[in-house]
Design a protein with these regions (language model features):
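Structural/interface elements that position substrates and couple domains in central-metabolism enzymes
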Residues: 1-185
C-alpha cells in the first residue's frame, strides 16, 4: 500500500517504512527485496495483501478519528467560551498527548479510506459506530466553519449577502496542490 506524505519535505518515500505483501510467498519476498533497495527506513513484510491493505486503511481511519475528536472538542469549547488552541497547548504539555488540530478533513485518503472499511464491515453485518460517527463529524465541519464565519460577520455587522470572502487553504494540507475531496468548495 501507498505510504507517502505529500508536501512533507522531511518524510519522503525512502524515509517512510514500507509495508509489503504479495499474492504468494515468492512474490511477497521479491516485492519486499525490491523495496528494501529503495526504502532506507526498511520494510515490514505483512503475511498477506489483506493485512497490508487493512493496515493502510486503519492508519488513515485512526487519523480521521483523532481529528474528529479534536473537531468535536473544538465545537464544545466554542460553546463553552473556551479557547481551543489554548486548551490544546496546555494538554500538549503532557508527554503522551497526541497533537491534532481541529479543521477540515479532505483529500483522497483520510476522508475516503474510513468508508472502505465501514462498507466492508457492513457487508459482513457489522455496524462500525465510532468510525461512522467520526466521519459524520468531519464531513460536517465545512458547514460548521461556514456557520461560524456567518455568525462572526453578523456580530461585526458585516453584510453576509454579496460579501466576498477569501479562503486560504483550498487543498487538504499545506504545500500540496491536490484538491480532491476538498471541503472548501
Amino acid at each position: 500500500p501507498e505510504r507517502i506524505n505529500p508536501g512533507d519535505k522531511q518524510h519522503r518515500l525512502p524515509s517512510i517504512r514500507k509495508v509489503t505483501a504479495g499474492s504468494n510467498s515468492t512474490s511477497a519476498e521479491f516485492i519486499d527485496q525490491l523495496y528494501q533497495r529503495i526504502i532506507t527506513a526498511g520494510t515490514h513484510k505483512a503475511s498477506s495483501i489483506k493485512v497490508a491493505e487493512a493496515a493502510k486503511v486503519i492508519e488513515n481511519t485512526q487519523r480521521d478519528l483523532n481529528i474528529a475528536l479534536i473537531n468535536e472538542l473544538a465545537m464544545l469549547f466554542n460553546k463553552l467560551g473556551i479557547d481551543t488552541r489554548e486548551v490544546l497547548d496546555a494538554a500538549g504539555s503532557k508527554w503522551n498527548f497526541l497533537p491534532f488540530s481541529p479543521g477540515l478533513v479532505g483529500g483522497h485518503c483520510i476522508s475516503v479510506d474510513p468508508y472502505y472499511l465501514t462498507h466492508k464491515a457492513q457487508e459482513i453485518g457489522y455496524h462500525p459506530e465510532v468510525i461512522l460517527a467520526g466521519r459524520k463529524i468531519n464531513d460536517g465541519m465545512g458547514a460548521y466553519v461556514a456557520e461560524q464565519v456567518i455568525k462572526l460577520m453578523t456580530r461585526k455587522k458585516i453584510a453576509v449577502v454579496d460579501s466576498k470572502i477569501l479562503v486560504l487553504g483550498f487543498t487538504f494540507k499545506e504545500n500540496c496542490p491536490d484538491i480532491r475531496n476538498t471541503l472548501v468548495a
